[in-house]
Amino acid sequence: MIITTTPTIDGHQITEYKGLVFGEVVSGANFIRDFFASITDVIGGRSGAYESKLNSARQEALAELEKEAKRVGANAVVGVSMEYQSMGGDKGMFIVVATGTAVVIR
């Protein structure tokens, strides 16, 4: 399945629009990771633990998006965007949402 941020796919024609599809993942970090990430922030480095968690959540959201697109009979998703938002206050929770338009291409 082709998943792209662009509204069209070079070399393919969109023959049918199936509608909006979403992939949503809510994730949280644990106390130990939070502690070491805060130390990293103080000394000015990058938090590999958080980056890894965010990357995993992004991949899961895209997998959910693809699953939903297949469910509605699409073979591609165009116009994909990703949103990241913290939630749960100081509990270290965040949500990653992938949104796009499911289409049939040939």
From Swiss-Prot:
Q: What's the name of the protein?
A: UPF0145 protein APL_0465
Tell me where on the tree of life, at the top rank, the source sits: Bacteria
Traced from the root, the source organism's taxonomic lineage reads: Bacteria, Pseudomonadati, Pseudomonadota, Gammaproteobacteria, Pasteurellales
Transmembrane segments annotated in the record for this chain: none
- Return the PANTHER family for the record: UPF0145 PROTEIN YBJQ
Q: Which InterPro entries match?
A: UPF0145_dom_sf, UPF0145_YbjQ-like
UniProt family annotation: Belongs to the UPF0145 family.
